[in-house]
């Protein structure tokens, strides 16, 4: 596929203009601009479960990529004005002004270092000390399409570790949305084609539907057991169970796993 054809498919000119405009804005201004431009059709359930103040972690599944962050921002700003995101460090490398809303994380193992990890934890500690709302997509990667269904990737245990260390309540959030067929076609071909479509996948979602379901809050005291086991249970609860049974608590869900085991 030639570059001109690819650029035409991906609306490169429009994407470039938007990216250049965002370079002049702070993170919060950028999120507001994108939320206004995209005007998602949001189907929100359980927003009253989100505390209006105090430190907390919103732990969400990751179906589409950048659009997930904008959709969550659009929902949370109805209740909170202090939201920050754990997000790929590339966002801050592209625009250093995003530090007002992004705690940079190196999700890829080959990009990590002890110094970068310490800096991420330092910034997270500051956010919790300021009693902020911290959003984490613990997979760090988009869900995969398998046999026509989206499968959430494995979660990093950071979300559980932070909740315990910072004594932060977790608000589970199930998101339901899809990318375009073009994205999934490219994703099957190779990772490079998949990755260059991500900004296009954000901008092509104008007036698209997002379902956002908040589950009952999870206390750090509910996160008993090994970090690996708790993280896996939390992933399955948020990505799958919560979308089907929005009123089930995490503790009740874990009890069913014990009974089945």
Task: Please place each PLM-identified region on the residue numbering.
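Membrane-anchoring hydrophobic helices of lipid-metabolizing enzymes
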Residues: 1-59, 69-71, 78-80, 252-261
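Catalytic core of membrane glycerolipid acyltransferases/transacylases, capturing the structured
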Residues: 9-13, 57-113
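A conditional alpha-helix N-cap/helix-loop micro-motif detector
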Residues: 24, 40, 113-118, 152-153
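Short, conserved catalytic or adaptor-binding loops enriched in Gly and charged residues
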Residues: 32-36, 94, 202-205
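Short, charged beta->alpha transition segments
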Residues: 41-47, 88-91, 120-127
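Residue-level detector of flexible, active-site-proximal loop/helix-junction positions
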Residues: 49, 90-92, 109, 177-179, ...
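Short secondary-structure boundary/hinge segments and terminal tails
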Residues: 52-53, 94, 145, 181
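Non-catalytic C-terminal accessory region of glycerolipid acyltransferases
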Residues: 117-261
């Amino acid at each position: 596929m030639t570059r001109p054809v690819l650029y035409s498919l991906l609306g490169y000119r429009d994407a470039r203009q938007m990216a250049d405009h965002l370079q002049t804005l702070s993170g919060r201004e950028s999120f507001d601009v994108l939320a206004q431009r995209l005007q998602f059709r949001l189907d929100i359930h359980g927003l009253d479960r989100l505390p209006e103040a105090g430190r907390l972690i919103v732990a969400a599944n990751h179906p589409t990529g950048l659009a997930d962050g904008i959709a969550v921002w659009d929902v949370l700003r109805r209740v909170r004005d202090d939201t920050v995101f754990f997000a790929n460090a590339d966002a801050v490398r592209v625009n250093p002004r995003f530090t007002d809303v992004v705690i940079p994380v190196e999700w890829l193992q080959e990009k990590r270092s002890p110094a970068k990890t310490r800096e991420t934890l330092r910034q997270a500690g500051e956010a919790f000390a300021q009693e902020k709302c911290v959003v984490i997509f613990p997979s760090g990667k988009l869900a995969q399409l398998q046999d026509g269904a989206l499968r959430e990737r494995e979660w990093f245990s950071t979300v559980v570790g932070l909740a315990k260390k910072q004594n932060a309540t977790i608000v589970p959030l199930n998101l339901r949305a899809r990318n375009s067929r073009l994205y999934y076609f490219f994703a099957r071909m190779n990772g490079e084609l998949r990755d260059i479509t991500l900004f296009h996948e954000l901008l092509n979602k104008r007036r698209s539907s997002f379902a956002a379901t908040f589950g009952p809050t999870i206390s750090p005291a509910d996160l008993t057991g090994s970090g690996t086991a708790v993280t896996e249970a939390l992933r399955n609860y948020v990505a799958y169970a919560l979308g089907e049974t929005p009123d089930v608590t995490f503790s009740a869900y874990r009890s069913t796993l014990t009974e089945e085991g």
